[in-house]
């Protein structure tokens, strides 16, 4: 079943937007944070639209979200997200430093029509970072404490749709549930691509999400959803080693450092089967008193970007395409000298129907000045990769279960 057909089976948010009703809305505003400050508020902007819909309808919105994971530097309170949400909503919201305790429950009960209450980082709850089947997650404290206070559940966090966690899959088991506009838009945009059945569709795959990206490449080619694939970043390193077998180069050292040597054989198998459709790097840029392009056989330093010859070859692939799915950068985009490959490819792709996925890709698109030219900008990182790879999303499965169980 195609994504457009699936989303049609799930009630959209309009079914849940009722004056005086309490909605639990799961969004994903997980954002890059440096020195305690949010440096990219793209997801917050996207989800502010959803919260505005709820507020304008006179619903009472209880917002669940997370930031980082326990033990990570970016695991912070959602209080720092509050002013960003208010900025894009152009209205005040409430925040409570609690999730399922007496204070949170009291404030939920006292919400007035049109008000929005942001709860604390849901991953403070240890049960939220444990993945289980939806029926088990429906028995967690989070769901048992909050569900009785709500009339509906709205899932809008596409970027966390691949997680089988309580805030994602638990509530649909016990509450009538709807798909939020961000989530619906994501599935419809990707569904439109898959309806093309690969004709004129190219995937530019970079970054370092190795297992997921490799699986996505395999599934997209196997199912005929893309015609061509061009690989860069760490993914490109693995494919280059699989194709050229340059096992004594700095390339191997970088792959080994990431623990990805076992994936070289899988890349080799994909190249043997789909070699004419997969384009791999032939040169790389290194830092040698500035940017220097080096061919794959002469590489003796850590590669930081695709080289000039590779960039030209990939641009030719893009120019022959109708749709370009861009997931992951080609190099170390934090350094302008090594963002060149990614930015040039993004500029070329902006003349096609461009779909962007992943935080680093979006940041690069902003640098390249092409973000506004994209046909669709996904809020998802790993969820985006897994969706285009054809994996079943736990959130989708839970929402379909809810749609069968409850009549809206």
From Swiss-Prot:
Entries under Pfam families matching the protein: PGK (PF00162)
Binding residues for substrate: 28-30, 43, 66-69, 123, 163
Name by which UniProt lists this protein: Phosphoglycerate kinase
GO terms for biological process, alphabetical: gluconeogenesis; glycolytic process
Alphabetically ordered keywords of this record: ATP-binding, Cytoplasm, Glycolysis, Kinase, Nucleotide-binding, Transferase
Source organism, top-level taxon: Archaea
InterPro entries documented for this protein: Phosphoglycerate_kinase, Phosphoglycerate_kinase_N, Phosphoglycerate_kinase_sf
Gene Ontology MF annotations: ADP binding; ATP binding; phosphoglycerate kinase activity
Pathway(s) this gene product operates in, as recorded in its UniProt entry: Carbohydrate degradation; glycolysis; pyruvate from D-glyceraldehyde 3-phosphate: step 2/5
Gene name per UniProt: pgk
Catalytic activity: (2R)-3-phosphoglycerate + ATP = (2R)-3-phospho-glyceroyl phosphate + ADP
Entry binding sites for ATP: 334, 358-361
Protein family according to the UniProt entry: Belongs to the phosphoglycerate kinase family.
Predominant subcellular localization, coarse grouping: cytoplasm
Organism per entry: Pyrobaculum aerophilum (strain ATCC 51768 / DSM 7523 / JCM 9630 / CIP 104966 / NBRC 100827 / IM2)
Subcellular location field: Cytoplasm
Oligomer and partners: Monomer.
Enzyme Commission number(s) from the entry: 2.7.2.3
Enzyme superclass (EC): transferase
GO CC annotation: cytosol
